[in-house]
Curated annotation (Swiss-Prot):
Family: Belongs to the Casparian strip membrane proteins (CASP) family.
Lineage: Eukaryota, Viridiplantae, Streptophyta, Embryophyta, Tracheophyta
Pfam family, one: CASP_dom
Residue ranges that the UniProt entry lists as topological domain Cytoplasmic: 1-6, 74-79, 152-171
GO CC annotation, single: plasma membrane
Localization per Swiss-Prot or TrEMBL: Cell membrane
The protein's name: CASP-like protein 1C3
Length: 171
């Protein structure tokens, strides 16, 4: 039987794994052909370095998340997992920040630089990018919750304390 602490950690890791995998698949398959006046073009994630970085970072975290599912809770490797959770959470945050900046320019354009918005011409592509970013945000939020929970349980086990109660009986 799985311990309740391990069950919560496992559930959070499964959610994070699914979200990063979804972000990779959605972004990597995003493409659409469009035209603007007489110009024909194809919008795809691989044309943008920030989107490639997003896919690569999420793929790395997906593999890590899958492997972390199989580490026993009694293993001394959990200290390393805690440190890697922090590193990979920061990696996800940096990749989504870069991708979100490019997506914003694609949606709104930048009149100062003379960049026109493209989402009016390639709406399917922009919707796929938005879906990938939403999945990425779900992964980040899940990893932050997982990180906080892991730190909490690690410190409690390190200090030999049980979680404190917020209220006393009879109050």
């Amino acid at each position: 039987m799985v311990k309740p602490k391990r069950l919560l950690s496992l559930l959070l890791r499964l959610i994070a794994f699914g979200a990063t995998l979804a972000a990779v698949i959605i972004m990597a398959t995003s493409h659409e052909k469009g035209s603007f006046f007489a110009l024909s073009y194809e919008a795809k994630y691989s044309d943008t370095p920030a989107f490639k970085y997003f896919v690569i970072a999420n793929a790395i975290v997906t593999v890590y998340g899958f492997l972390a599912l199989f580490i026993p809770s009694e293993s001394p490797l959990w200290r390393l997992v805690l440190a890697l959770d922090l590193v990979f959470t920061m990696l996800l945050i940096s990749s989504i920040s870069a991708a979100l900046a490019v997506a914003q320019v694609g949606k709104k354009g930048n009149s100062s630089a003379g960049w026109l918005p493209v989402c009016g011409q390639v709406t399917k592509y922009c919707n796929q990018v938005t879906g990938a970013l939403v999945a990425g945000f779900i992964a980040i939020i899940t990893y932050i919750i997982l990180l906080l929970y892991s730190i909490y349980t690690f410190l409690n086990s390190l200090l030999g304390k049980t979680p404190c109660r917020l209220s006393s009986p009879g109050i």
